[in-house]
UniProtKB/Swiss-Prot annotation:
Gene from which this protein is expressed: plsX
Pfam families listed in its UniProt record: FA_synthesis (PF02504)
Enzyme Commission identifier(s): 2.3.1.274
Catalytic activity: a fatty acyl-[ACP] + phosphate = an acyl phosphate + holo-[ACP]
Protein name: Phosphate acyltransferase
Family: Belongs to the PlsX family.
Organism: Ligilactobacillus salivarius (strain UCC118)
Pathway listed: Lipid metabolism; phospholipid metabolism
Subunit field text: Homodimer. Probably interacts with PlsY.
Amino acid sequence: MKKIAVDAMGGDFAPQSVVEGVEKARNKYPDLRFMLFGDEQKIREILTSDKNIEIIQTTEVIDMNDEPVKAIRRKKDSSLVRAAYAVKEGKADALFSCGNTGALLAAGLLIVGRIKGITRPGLLSTLPVLTKEGGAFNLLDSGANADNKPEQLYQYALLGKYYAESVRNIKNPRIGLLNNGTEPHKGSKLTLEAHNLIAADSSINFVGNVESKDILKGVCDVVVADGFTGNAVLKAIEGTAGTAMHLLKDTIMSAGLLGKIGGLLLKPSIMKIRNKMSASQYGGAVLLGAKAPVVKAHGASDAETVYYTVKQINDMLENDMLSKFTDYFNKNV
């Protein structure tokens, strides 16, 4: 039976949302086991049943203001560090946190470790496709690294391909390289060299360069980017979506009685748009290239988002995604 090590104290609404989400997932996936690291008293005040759940008492918490690497090294009894060591020592199969992103990435790299051959693990996020048909795409790297080399972007193309195949069940996923134009000759030295490396691998269904204005239209299944650019794109998408919904609400509320009546009539459609723009149903961001699944959900995650993130981790474990990664890179890198 697979076991997930959970940082129960990480996140804006921890441990409440974490425990509630884990319990919902436990009820849905009876073969999963959970190790909850954190303040046992606070956890038990929320927990309705400890079936398939083990609580490990810790005395420290890494908060959002802590410097990641220092916190990992100094707060040895923090819920995140203890959870990471549980994975490293083989007591758990995956690591999950809603807490400090940098600290989780540091724990993934320094404690869990990286797959042999992977020089820079990347952070993979799943985002919605905003077309009538719907769907989603993966963005990799979405913020684990500020600088990348062409070889690393090529590795991201491979990692994204295996993730899309194993977890999202997409056959022959389309891989695109984020650039400032679709023409092969456009881009920086980094993207030009990365383009050549990816295009040379016949095992990758490479659709070429893609522009940021098109990725929400579903032009590819996996978007490859350096971490700096990928993170900027991710935050621009999140910010635009949030701003658009606020603008729509403010416009309706300031339009007088007729505007409010119109808004009431449009409410079901507006809710559909909001739900389509939400990425919570796809789970968290995955540190691809680590020796085990290391998954980060948003700091403001509610119980529903925690549940979907556990579902995502369960899919990764059931499909044996890490073995496929490891076998490939051991043989080819």
